[in-house]
Amino acid sequence: MSGYLITIGLETHVQLKTRTKMFCGCSLAFGTESNTNVCPVCLGYPGALPVMNREAVKLTVMSGLMLGCEINRVSTFDRKNYFYPDMSKDYQISQQAKPLCLGGGVTIQMPEGQKRIRINHIHLEEDAAKINHSARFSGVDFNRCGTPLMEIVSEPGLSSPEEAMAYLQSLKQILVYAGVSDCNLEEGNMRSDVNISVRPEGQEALGTKVEIKNMNTFKGIYAALEYEIARQLGAVSHGGVIVQETRRWEAELGETQPMRTKENAHDYRYFPEPDLVPIVLSAEQVEAWRALLPELPSMRRVRMMAEYGIPEYDAGVLADAKENADFFEAAARLCGQGQGKTVSNWFMTEIMRLLSETGKTITQCALTPEALAELVALVNGRAINGPTAKELLPELFNNGGMPGVLVHARGLGQVSDAGTLEAFVEQAIRENPKSVEDYKAGKKAAAGFLVGQVMKLSHGKAAPQQVGKLVTEKLAERV
């Protein structure tokens, strides 16, 4: 609706990829029986003391570095006090006064160009337990309680559901690239609280904020934003007043519904966590962690275009998943200069088809970059033809091995002997007189049919280019 500005901010909670919980040694294995991965610390027993997970600190700092944040070399934990069944000790250990990471941002690509979405801060905390509701009762599963959770708080700089999606997808890609989280939405690894407000154009102050809690699917976030923006615009355009409140998304109804009103910011009565010492990081430690960072996906796309001569679309598809880009680059380097597009074609057609059919990732299949590079070399050297290579690829994908060994063992080498090929061509012409007559009548497609017959006679081993040339020459003699 013209005349109004939309403002969106996101608070994204990301479960970090650690083996154990934030303040105890309990396992984080997903899918285990309820309330089995627990101990006195994560259950909040009196007198149980937390011990900080160093790996969680490292992964949070690495995330901040990937996102261009300033790292707070002295960081502290605080107690966020609230009473709710999902936090048995009645407070959450979080960071409020001195979070680990400050500033930074995510660059998104929109149809109108690039836009930088600024981040306010990233803090580290423990996750709450999971409340499971049934028809007659609710239960609390404390397996999740204490999971290392990184909260990435954006500035209110998003102005549409499309921008919110671009931000979340870019953020997810960067974090997965860095190896700090799986960002598996189905397992709850990535969840967002969404803040939306509307205000008249020209008004500096933001409108009244409405928060939608704990959204765990991109599709749901997009739909909730669309609905809530329309609801708020409809209200203010008819003289209504937006109430500051927390709402939930009801996917089955396709609408947001009130949970609780918030006349003022909720008072969590933060105070410094007395059982944990501050995190003190040296410059050397921060730089050591910086050295572990991968290349940003956006930078990798640009570099691969320049280094391997592949188009922007190919680079975007390949760089979308780090393991795919790693595989492509390894194979392209083995193939040598000028073969980037060839390797890209193989990966984006045949290999991605096999990945889709099997539901595997490239790291889960048996195909290696060395095998793909050798397959490309065999085709380029005319030791085998394209159809034979495509027949070999599924076996290499499923069972591994090297294509040269398979070609030798099965006698699949390409037939390029002129005399042998000429005999095949003569046989095809002799057995298909109608095609010869069609060619004489000007139907050039008849030559292609005869080439196919030669390939069939040679069991796919004939060199296609030589066959095409021979067929054309033999037909010309008969015109």
What are the roles of these predicted feature ranges?
Residues 188-200, 268, 305-329, 340-357, ...:
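Core structural elements
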Residues 17, 199, 230, 348-356, ...:
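Amphipathic alpha-helical core segments of compact helical bundles
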Residues 1-295, 306, 312, 334-338, ...:
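Basic, nucleic-acid-interacting segments
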Residues 279-280, 315, 327-330, 339-342, ...:
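Extended hydrophobic-aromatic, low-complexity segments
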Residues 285-292, 299, 330-337, 372-384:
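Extended, non-catalytic structural segments that build the interaction scaffolds
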